[in-house]
From Swiss-Prot:
Its cofactor is Mg(2+). Tetramer of two alpha and two beta subunits. It catalyses: tRNA(Phe) + L-phenylalanine + ATP = L-phenylalanyl-tRNA(Phe) + AMP + diphosphate + H(+). GO terms for biological process: phenylalanyl-tRNA aminoacylation. Belongs to the class-II aminoacyl-tRNA synthetase family. Phe-tRNA synthetase alpha subunit type 1 subfamily. Mg(2+) binds at E254. It comes from Chlorobium phaeovibrioides (strain DSM 265 / 1930) (Prosthecochloris vibrioformis (strain DSM 265)). This is Phenylalanine--tRNA ligase alpha subunit. Transmembrane segments: none annotated. The keyword ATP-binding applies. One of its GO terms (cellular component) is cytoplasm.
Amino acid sequence: MEKSISSLQQQINAAPLNSEADIESFRLLYTVRKGLIAALFSQLKSVDPTDRPRIGNLLNQLKESAEARIAEAAESISHHEESSQPVIDLTLPGRVSFTGSEHPVQKVLGEMKRIFSAMGFAMATGPELELDSYNFDMLNFPPDHPARDMQDTFFIKRNGNEDDVLLRTHTSPVQVRVMLEEPPPIRVICPGKVYRNEAISSRSYCVFHQLEGLYIDKGVTFADLKATIYSFAHQMFGSDVKLRFRPSFFPFTEPSAEVDVTCYLCGGKGCKVCKKSGWLEIMGCGMVHPNVIQNCGIDPEVWSGYAFGMGVDRTVLLHYKIDDIRLLFENDIRMLRQFTA
């Protein structure tokens, strides 16, 4: 019996315990109820009664030795796993992760919406894929107007005698839809993307953002229009900005004007951006043509109104003193990071 205990002790001492799998195999072989140590305990009753206490003590030592090996191996493996993990120094300062922000076009558009909202304008939107009748006919464009040519407009589908489908060239069709659906008085702004078949340069792009405004009520005058534009320009560009109104022509307004502000780069002295004039155009405007009002089912003898439209992207250039409109569409993260809030 003593030889069996000694032999088993040598096996226990020599058994490799380098992994959790080794420990589990060791436990199943030696320390479980039907293991080798338990088998020796079952033979204890056949030992001479005078030797039984001594042999029983040796068996207990054998069992404790096996359990001690299991505990030591488990602790060693656990310590090794912990030491192999990367140490996190909680005293180090945290890393500031990059956070995105609104695109400069959206930032400026949001400010424009806020200004006009404070003046009482509601917001209206419409489809970018538009019908020829809404984009041209109802806005008093004659059939031979240059804007109807393929060189200026992206036509999606030519339908012969029916309505052509095109990418809208301005957000004015939204004004038409509003006048058809809502009774006056009407006071809305219409922001959105528009498309024109233009050469891409530092000052123009084939797709850009526009915001137009419409006010229909009784007794509306050009003086009301000027007051609105002056208020917007001073809030958007600063109270020291200078404006000028130049006579112009638009099929949907009469009289019509274009509005210029002093150049943001040269302060009115003349540079390449303003083409040495000292002025930059920011919008077109005018009194809504009676034909347009009548086309929308409103009596022009009773109701009058004004409309204006501006390129949001050009306003961004003015606001942030950017000299190339193409930068707004390139998604260059180096440029956009400058606008992180």
